[in-house]
Amino acid sequence: EQGMSAYCYTGSYQIPVHTLTDSIVKDIMMIQEIIGTGEIAISDHRSSQPTFEEFARVVADTRLGGVLSGKAGIVNVHLGDSPRCLDLIERVVDETEIPASQILPTHINRNEMLFGKSIEYALKGGAVDFTGNEDIDYWETICDEVRVCNGIKRMLDAGVNPDRMTISSDGQGSLPMYSSDGEFLGMGVGQSSCLLKEVKECVFKTEIPLEIAISTITSNPADILRLKGKGKVQEGYDADLCILDQKLQL
């Protein structure tokens, strides 16, 4: 009625997943706005330390819900600092019939080790999601986080399909703040405005073509999440438009 589109995932960091009905499949089938499950945490001290079987069942149920409802049935996966990195995701892809297209790992630029593993995963056809930051220099200074523009450039140079990369903001989510010594200072709030800032960096800092940079926050997420009528300026699509000048200022 308001002309706004909104989508969400069922679940949380933990497995067993907290659902609105009594199952993941029913949530996705019966609630129009729910397009998948997430953000399931793995390789992180804040996760529920799921086993392979538990994680695989969540992905399988989410895929089934997507098939029955005509939605993406995506599992958005939070990746932490553990050296296990994408191990559970890779096992699902390698050991079951579930394709990599059902899983979207996020925070892949959290550290250098995870990023290296993510390049390997993306080269196999998996989609990967970078986490953008409002204060880009701050995060690069206090940890070994891979700057988004540098990460995308490295993936492109490695031969990753540009269509398999997205940037998300953690907008309005909790954002831990640390000192230069790694001391926890408190919680901030993620800002969705970081998305355009990261695109600017891609274009002006690492000279990534605008059509590739802008697709990470437009057509790529729309295609991966199967959001009908979204992500492109095209006849029959929603007119979700932002007007930018030559310096990419809104």
Where are the predicted features?
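Short, intrinsically disordered, charge-balanced linker/junction segments flanking boundaries
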Residues: 1, 244-250
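Conserved beta-strand edge residues that scaffold enzyme active sites
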Residues: 13-14, 135, 217
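Active-site core of metal-dependent hydrolases
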Residues: 46-47, 54, 60-178, 184-185
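General structural feature for long, well-ordered alpha-helical segments within catalytic domains
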Residues: 51-58, 71, 84-88, 114-117, ...
